Regions:
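Motif-centric detector for short Cys/His coordination patterns
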Residues: 1-67
């Protein structure tokens, strides 16, 4: 997944929910803007769940769904 694509999804206004599937089979759904964080270069993103935070390397993203 290209960093530019992820940045576009995260920064679009208004925010629209989307999900990702990783190369290890894990899936994460970003339902609102506060569910995701990233440094300025977007080479990693952070998923903020109810009781967890997961660091995700954007190179491990295979699919974006629900855009």
């Amino acid at each position: 997944m290209k960093v530019k694509e992820i940045k576009g999804l995260v920064e679009r206004q208004p925010f629209r929910p989307f999900g990702i599937r990783l190369n290890n089979g894990a899936q994460y759904r970003f339902k609102e803007a506060r569910d995701i964080g990233a440094p300025k270069d977007y080479h990693i993103i952070i998923y903020f769940g109810e009781k967890e935070a997961v660091l995700i390397d954007t190179d491990s993203i295979l699919e974006v769904f629900g855009r």
